[in-house]
Amino acid sequence: MEHVFKIVNADDLDSIDLFNNIDNLKDITGESMAGYMTYGVWILFGRKPVGVWECLQVGQSSNIGSEIISDVKCLSGEIKTKEGIEYINQFGQKVPNYTYNVYLSPREQIYERVGKEYNKFVFVCICCGEIYKDEKKAIEKYAAWKFRALFWRNGGSFKEAKENVQEPEDIENIKPTIKNSIDNMVKKYNEHIK
C-alpha cells in the first residue's frame, strides 16, 4: 500500500483544514524534520483508504524529529525482524554456530500493522523546543486523554479492559495556550468525525 506522511505545526492549523486537504502540508523528509530535532509533543492522525481521520497516537520525546522518522519507518514496514544474527560475545569474538533473532518491539509491531490498514498519516506538532522539556509528559497525557488516542499507552498497557478510566494526573500545570490549542484541535476533530 502506498502511504502519505505529512507534518504540520499546531500553530498553523487556524489557516489549514487539516482533515479535508492534506496536500498543502509538508511531506516528512529529512529536510522538513530538521526543525523538529528537539523536545516536544506530537499527535498522529491516520486515515484508511475508505473512512474518516482517526487520532491514532500521541507522543513526546527529547527529539521528536528522530522519533517521527522512526515511526514513519515502522508504519511503512521498513523495520523487519532480523533473523540469524551471529552471536558476538563481550570479547568481540563470534561464537560458532550461535545465532539469534531480533524481533520487533510491541511499538514496532503495532505500527507495522497500522501501516497495513491506514494509508494517510499526519503528524501534528503540538509544541517543539527546549522550553517544553519539563512539561512534555503532561502535555502528552492531556492531548492523549482529550483525543482518546487509539493506541496511546501511559507507560504500559492495561492487562484487562476498563471503563471510566480517570483523567491523568499532573496536567494542571500545562500552559493555558497549549491547553487551548489542544482543546481547539479536539473540537475540530470531533466535528469532523460526526
Question: Where on the chain are the PLM-derived regions?
Answer:
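Boundary/linker segments flanking structured domains
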Residues: 1-56, 60-194
